[in-house]
Amino acid sequence: MAGNKKRGGRNMDQVKKAAVRSDGVGGSATNAELPMANLVRLIKKVLPGKAKIGGAAKGLTHDCAVEFVGFVGDEASEKAKAEHRRTVAPEDYLGSFGDLGFDRYVDPMDAYIHGYREFERAGGNRRVAPPPPAAATPLTPGGPTFTDAELQFLRSVIPSRSDDEYSGSSPAIGGYGYGYGYGKNM
């Protein structure tokens, strides 16, 4: 049963078959695992709002995208190997786009790569430490202190005076105005 184990919604045998291209050369298994949800999200961004996408269309588009990524990736990998490098650089992909006839994609991709590198240099990909917890805020000098989160919670639970005036259900009406139910009769 190990061969029929599900992974990403596909049978593992199907993944292995998808990883072998039609010319018999083995592609990488990661190409066959291009996330369908991400692809469908991209498709929905370019279609009109109420357009529906059939299951067969999703599958065919996924297969085409996997084939395209593999095709361009193999060409970029060959460029890196020709220069005796094991790491495929973004410039290898740019060159493979040009060599394969996708010239109009080279300039936008180059601009994106340049912007991404600037973002990285500026430290944009580093996780920022969360801000320190809010300092306690004194309500009155010498009185109790509450954090901003506690104040927000209290404001959501305790009705404001304006709510009391309009609802007519406040125990403070006719009382001393403290809003805690202490009326004249108590």
From Swiss-Prot:
Expressed in developing kernels. One of its GO terms (cellular component) is CCAAT-binding factor complex. The keyword Nucleus applies. Residues 1-24, 123-142 are annotated as: Disordered. It comes from Oryza sativa subsp. japonica. The keyword ATP-binding does not apply. One of its GO terms (biological process) is regulation of transcription by RNA polymerase II. The lineage of its organism: Eukaryota, Viridiplantae, Streptophyta, Embryophyta, Tracheophyta. The gene is NFYB1. Residues 34-40 bind DNA. InterPro entries: CBFA_NFYB_domain, Histone-fold, Transc_fact_NFYB/HAP3. This is Nuclear transcription factor Y subunit B-1. It is found in: Nucleus.
